[in-house]
């Protein structure tokens, strides 16, 4: 995943979270905001795993996003991983992220 697609700064994360548009899944919370271009930030809480494992999970998510190629979406997004995500295998993780990206690309705002 190219650097231009990645959000890193705290104020960038806060701006998107303050928009209060979100999808909540058992394994992932996705905050999003309409934008001119696609950008994504990935957050994994410190209490879930040591730094090596958190970085490994971030690399996995970036790899999955590279396979899906959602770069034509005009959204800024924050993916926050939940504890259940750690127990999934790679294929299940891939399906979860695909499901989320499809939801946002179809424009389904309400999720219950």
From Swiss-Prot:
Organism, as annotated: Mycoplasma mobile (strain ATCC 43663 / 163K / NCTC 11711) (Mesomycoplasma mobile)
Superkingdom per UniProt: Bacteria
Keyword Nuclease: yes
Recorded catalytic activity of this chain's protein: Endonucleolytic cleavage of RNA, removing 5'-extranucleotides from tRNA precursor
A GO MF term: 3'-tRNA processing endoribonuclease activity
HAMAP family to which the protein is assigned, alphabetical: RNase_P (MF_00227)
Keyword RNA-binding among UniProt keywords: yes
Pfam family, one: Ribonuclease_P
Record's protein name: Ribonuclease P protein component
Any one annotated GO CC term: ribonuclease P complex
BP term (GO), one: tRNA 5'-leader removal
Residue ranges of coiled coil: none
UniProt similarity note: Belongs to the RnpA family.
Keywords, ordered alphabetically: Endonuclease, Hydrolase, Nuclease, RNA-binding, tRNA processing
Enzyme class, UniProt record, top EC level: hydrolase
Subunit (UniProt): Consists of a catalytic RNA component (M1 or rnpB) and a protein subunit.
Reported function: RNaseP catalyzes the removal of the 5'-leader sequence from pre-tRNA to produce the mature 5'-terminus. It can also cleave other RNA substrates such as 4.5S RNA. The protein component plays an auxiliary but essential role in vivo by binding to the 5'-leader sequence and broadening the substrate specificity of the ribozyme.
């Amino acid at each position: 995943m190219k650097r231009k697609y990645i959000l890193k700064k705290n104020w960038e994360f806060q701006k998107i979270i303050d928009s209060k548009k979100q999808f909540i899944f058992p394994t992932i919370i996705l905050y999003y905001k309409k934008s001119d271009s696609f950008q994504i930030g990935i957050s994994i809480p410190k209490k879930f795993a040591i730094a090596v494992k958190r970085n490994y999970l971030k690399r996995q998510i970036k790899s999955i996003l590279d396979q899906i190629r959602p770069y034509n979406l005009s959204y800024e997004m924050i993916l926050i991983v939940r504890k259940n995500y750690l127990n999934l295998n790679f294929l299940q993780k891939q399906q979860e992220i695909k499901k989320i990206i499809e939801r946002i690309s179809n424009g389904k705002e309400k999720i219950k």
